[in-house]
Amino acid sequence: MASLGINLDHIATVRQARRTVEPDPVHLALLAELGGADGITVHLREDRRHIQDRDVELLRQTVRTRLNLEMAATAEMVAIALTIKPDMVTLVPEKRQEVTTEGGLDVVSQAAALQGQISQLQGAGIPVSLFVDPERAQLQASQRSGARWVELHTGSYAEASWSQQPLELARLIEGTTEARQLGLRVNAGHGLTYQNVEPIAAISGMEELNIGHTVMARAMAVGLQEAVKQMKELVSAPRQEPLFGAGLAAES
């Protein structure tokens, strides 16, 4: 059974639109936990467009489940993580011009730099996950980097047409299998909604789904605690069995 991590970045986006103090991600993290969230995820971007350093500091003190800090693989962010000591760090690609994270890390081309950062973080007792596309070469490079986890990018699945979605699902299923055979633990996220989450939650070996935008959108109608509860029910007991089909992309 997959667990549920709730991403609070969009709460901070609303706050930063007016540069004010509300809505407060720290307060809403508590409501998410009361709704059944198994963890809280925030992305501290280099441009600080939504989550701020102070948010992360306060969340570290108040989160009672798990705190997953998404961040770019930079010296500045590694130093912050070593100070804050979240329960997990997820290294993600970052571009200043993007609206949201657009794809997975290219671990293959960044292997040397990533190995050093991963060693620093895990040497301090902070498990590291790499946000990657479900491609064999990236998974193999992730394993060689020393990371203990990967988070599979589900954006292509979420954005696929009805006819293409089973093929994208098959890539995620096979990517999960490949990662586990390499000794990696597996999470997933990006673009998941109440309508498409169940096949991903049903994948054997999938440990946690990180979901934000769709939950915040529903929270506007039903409140955050209820929105999290509804998503938790889908993730905990998915009704749909996964489909099987296409092979891994970018075979090495």
UniProtKB/Swiss-Prot annotation:
Annotated keywords: Cytoplasm, Pyridoxine biosynthesis, Transferase
Catalytic reactions of this protein: 3-amino-2-oxopropyl phosphate + 1-deoxy-D-xylulose 5-phosphate = pyridoxine 5'-phosphate + phosphate + 2 H2O + H(+)
Chain positions recorded as 3-amino-2-oxopropyl phosphate binding sites: 7, 18, 191, 212-213
Binding site for 1-deoxy-D-xylulose 5-phosphate: 9-10, 45, 50, 100
Pathway in which the depicted protein is active: Cofactor biosynthesis; pyridoxine 5'-phosphate biosynthesis; pyridoxine 5'-phosphate from D-erythrose 4-phosphate: step 5/5
A single cellular component GO annotation: cytosol
InterPro entries: Aldolase_TIM, PyrdxlP_synth_PdxJ, Pyridoxine-5'_phos_synth
GO terms (BP aspect): pyridoxine biosynthetic process
Compartments reported by the entry: Cytoplasm
Pfam families: PdxJ
Active site: 43, 70, 190
Record site: Transition state stabilizer: 151
Recorded GO MF terms: pyridoxine 5'-phosphate synthase activity
E.C. designation(s): 2.6.99.2
Task performed by this protein: Catalyzes the complicated ring closure reaction between the two acyclic compounds 1-deoxy-D-xylulose-5-phosphate (DXP) and 3-amino-2-oxopropyl phosphate (1-amino-acetone-3-phosphate or AAP) to form pyridoxine 5'-phosphate (PNP) and inorganic phosphate.
NCBIfam families: pdxJ, PRK05265.1-1, PRK05265.1-3, PRK05265.1-5
Subunit composition and interactions: Homooctamer; tetramer of dimers.
Family: Belongs to the PNP synthase family.
Protein name: Pyridoxine 5'-phosphate synthase
Organism for this UniProt entry: Synechococcus sp. (strain RCC307)
UniProt lineage: Bacteria, Bacillati, Cyanobacteriota, Cyanophyceae, Synechococcales
